[in-house]
Regions:
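Juxtamembrane helix-loop junctions of ABC transporter transmembrane domains
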Residues: 11-18, 41-42, 49-65, 69, ...
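Helix-loop-helix
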Residues: 180-194, 268-337, 342-343
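ABC-type nucleotide-binding domain
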Residues: 78, 351-352, 358-602
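Transmembrane helix-loop-helix hairpins at lipid-water interfaces of multipass membrane proteins
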Residues: 36-102, 182-187, 298-302
């Protein structure tokens, strides 16, 4: 009857649509259902042998007891022979061995089932993420997306391997044990259930109170994690402004609040657990006393008396753990539901069944009356029209939020237009496959992105089969070869995911070399020189001028000195093009561009 299990799962989250989620989860099992079927068969055999062992031992004890009484009455010498004792002992050992075998088998199969299902869902998530529009990622926190593919799936896997498996074993053991206990003696069984019910009610009442403190503990944990993350990511700025003490004080205060919330939660748990154990002890004493009286009166045999205690222990522990198991499964279902919510997100429009082909893009681009909004009710861009000839340099300028980057996203079909047409060499971009369209572009973004790998691998990201000579040539054209050769391992230098071993300007040079290697028909430079110093900017500008010759190039920049030679300048404001023309013409018109230019060079 005693159980040292912590009775409180303080982090319980319930699924919003439990029945729907369960049915879909069953459908998700697919080819893995046979493993679960075998698990159920193993659980049935495990439960059978677990329940039958005490019953068999009861018969053996009663047989020995009766032979002892007969020997005492007849005055004969009583002796347990090895043949008699060994046979029954061997039978019990076989039962225990069978329990162990079926327990190990069901645990192995359930773990295999959980990991296979985990792998299947993780694959579905990975494929889904590639089919989601950028607008989905814009409105989601990166951590929330990562949580679906990692934490939620791990919680599901853990619940299957522990919570679900233990629940099935517990139900079988409880039903089997209680049935035989009731068969032995209904009154003693009622006494056992009475004390078990009291301990369950006490655990439930305490858990409800604990949840309130647990919620506060979770909030404090989140606050502390955020402060630590801020202190790490902003450590240089904190030191630069001498705010170490203030940052440390905030972290200390959050740590104190977390400790206080945790202490109160743990106090309740540590106070109630001994109380529940006391209740269980009283139950054991009551069963022992009443059972002893019944034994003396001949209403209960010694074998059944000792077997009753075995069944009480077998049933008592899983009964008190049922709440924990159910809470664990509820949390897992909530995690599975969040995974399904991701899998049900609206996807990008599929590529045409028979897409058009551009074997050799030239770079002629036409925007005709383009309209766009993240939702139909909210239009962000309207009536955008302009034409770009092959090999021209187009500059896009405007204040933050004017729509410069959005315009490029529409060109590359990162977002779908709501109206109008975008033509590339006279072909509607929607008639092309996305992969085919994007092969025509090379991008250098404002935020450099380098992955964990060698410098050579990072440069060759867009052309994995590039030779070392091609990689070096691209690096030289981007003015990156010199600094690469100063590194200890040169092109084989391994960069971390944050590439902190090289400067921001050097990271920018590597991304430019990456684009140069791809040799695209159209270039997109989004603030390409915004994170480098003046000298590096001059080197990059010379390299880019060479690269842009004969190529259509879109340049987004706040520093107008980099785009005075553009063939066409688009001035954007609030999602519309308010001016377009070359530098000279726009200055002469005295409009928004002239005002912006004069403000930078006054």
């Amino acid at each position: 009857m005693e159980n040292d299990q912590n009775y409180f799962d303080t982090e319980v989250f319930e699924a919003k649509h439990m029945k729907k989620t369960i049915l879909r989860f069953i459908r998700s099992m697919g080819k893995q259902k046979w493993r679960l079927t075998v698990v159920f068969i193993c659980i049935a055999f495990y439960t059978y042998f677990t329940v039958m062992a005490p019953l068999y031992s009861a018969d053996v004890v009663d047989l020995i007891w009766n032979q002892m009484k007969e020997a005492m009455h007849t005055g004969q010498h009583f002796q347990i022979t090895w043949e008699f004792g060994g046979r029954h002992l061997f039978s019990l050992l076989l039962m225990f061995l069978a329990c162990g075998i079926f327990y190990s088998l069901q645990s192995f199969l359930m773990a295999s089932f959980a990991e296979k299902l985990n792998l299947q869902l993780r694959g579905e998530i990975s494929e889904k993420l590639n089919r989601l529009p950028l607008s989905y990622f814009d409105r989601q926190q990166p951590g929330a997306i990562m949580s679906r593919a990692t934490n939620d799936l791990e919680k599901m896997s853990e619940a299957l391997q522990t919570g679900l498996l233990r629940l099935f074993m517990a139900v079988g053991t409880i039903l089997g044990s209680l049935s035989i206990m009731a068969y032995f003696d209904g009154f003693l069984t009622a006494v056992f259930l009475f004390f078990t019910a009291i301990s369950l009610l006490a655990a439930k009442a305490a858990s409800q109170k604990t949840l309130r403190y647990a919620a506060r503990r979770q909030d404090c944990t989140g606050k502390l994690n955020s402060l630590i993350e801020e202190a790490y990511s902003g450590r240089m700025l904190i030191k630069a402004f001498n705010r170490e003490e203030e940052s440390l004080a905030q972290i200390r205060q959050a740590a104190v609040e977390l400790a206080d919330a945790s202490e109160k939660t743990d106090w309740i748990i540590n106070a109630i657990n001994p109380g529940i154990r006391v209740i269980n002890r009283f139950g054991q004493v009551a069963v022992a006393v009443l059972g002893g009286v019944m034994l003396l009166k001949g209403h209960l045999t010694p074998g059944r008396f000792q077997a009753f205690f075995q069944y009480a222990n077998q049933a008592g522990e899983p009964i008190t753990e049922l709440s924990y198991m159910i809470n664990s499964l509820q949390s897992a279902l909530a995690s599975v539901e969040r995974v399904y919510e991701l899998l049900d997100e609206e996807e990008i429009l599929p590529d045409p069944e028979h897409p058009a082909c551009l074997p050799a893009p030239k770079g002629h681009v036409d925007f005709s009356h383009i309209r766009f909004g993240y939702t139909p009710e909210r239009t962000l861009m309207s009536d955008i029209s302009f034409s770009v000839k092959e090999g021209q340099k187009i500059a896009i300028v405007g204040a933050t939020g004017a729509g410069k980057t959005t315009l490029i996203n529409l060109l590359m079909r990162f977002y779908e237009i709501g109206g109008g047409t975008i033509l590339l060499d006279g072909v509607d971009t929607r008639s092309l496959s996305r992969a085919g369209l994007r092969q025509a572009f090379g991008m250098v973004l404002q935020d450099t992105w380098l992955f964990e790998g060698t410098i050579a691998e990072n440069i060759a990201y867009g052309k994995p089969d590039a030779s070392r000579e091609e990689i070096i040539a691209a690096a030289k054209a981007a003015r990156a070869d010199f600094f690469i050769r100063t590194l200890p391992k040169g092109y084989d230098t391994v960069l971390g995911s944050d590439a902190e071993t090289i400067s921001a300007g050097q990271r920018q040079l590597l991304t430019i070399a990456r684009v140069m290697l791809c040799d695209p028909a159209i270039l997109i430079l989004d603030e390409a020189t915004s994170s480098v110093d003046t000298r590096t900017e001059m080197e990059i500008s010379r390299a880019m001028n060479t690269l842009m010759k004969g190529r259509t190039s879109f340049v987004i920049a706040h520093r107008l000195s980099t785009i005075v030679d553009a063939d066409l300048i688009l001035v954007m404001q609030n999602g519309t093009i308010i001016e377009q023309g070359n530098h000279k013409r726009l200055l002469e018109s005295g409009g928004a561009y002239a005002e912006l230019y004069n403000s930078q060079f006054a």
